């Protein structure tokens, strides 16, 4: 039997991802990237809720059901409003009682 759960709304997923990003970026990003992010985020920063990719197994080594997770990207957007410098990709469980997440940081 399939377990029912309420999916995260985009704003909540974005808030969760951004909070985690701010807390962990210093430990996971190159100091140059942190400086770039801090200098340009106000004008070019973006936190985007995107369609959950089905290739997370390659990133985290675990097969996931894309319907059970939200995906959020944190980065900088260019003049065409496309995110072309991604600092972190987040995979966040929709299950509130078991809110697990995975992060792929910019290398």
UniProtKB/Swiss-Prot annotation:
Q: Which residue windows are coiled coil?
A: none
**Protein name per Swiss-Prot or TrEMBL:** Putative double-stranded DNA mimic protein HS_0995
Q: What does the similarity note say?
A: Belongs to the putative dsDNA mimic protein family.
Q: Give the domain of life.
A: Bacteria
**InterPro entries per UniProt:** dsDNA_mimic_put, Put_dsDNA_mimic_sf
The function of this protein is:
May act as a double-stranded DNA (dsDNA) mimic. Probably regulates the activity of a dsDNA-binding protein.
Instruction: List, alphabetically, the Pfam families matched.
Output: DUF440
């Amino acid at each position: 039997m399939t377990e029912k759960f309420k999916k995260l709304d985009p704003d909540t997923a974005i808030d969760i991802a951004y909070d985690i990003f701010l807390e962990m970026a210093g430990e996971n990003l190159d100091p140059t990237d942190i400086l770039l992010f801090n200098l340009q985020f106000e004008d070019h920063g973006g936190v985007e809720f995107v369609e959950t990719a089905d290739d997370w197994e390659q990133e985290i080594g675990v097969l996931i059901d894309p319907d059970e997770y939200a995906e959020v990207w944190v980065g900088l957007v260019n003049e065409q409003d496309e995110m072309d410098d991604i600092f972190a990709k987040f995979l966040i469980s929709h299950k509130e009682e078991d809110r697990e997440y995975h992060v792929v940081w910019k290398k």
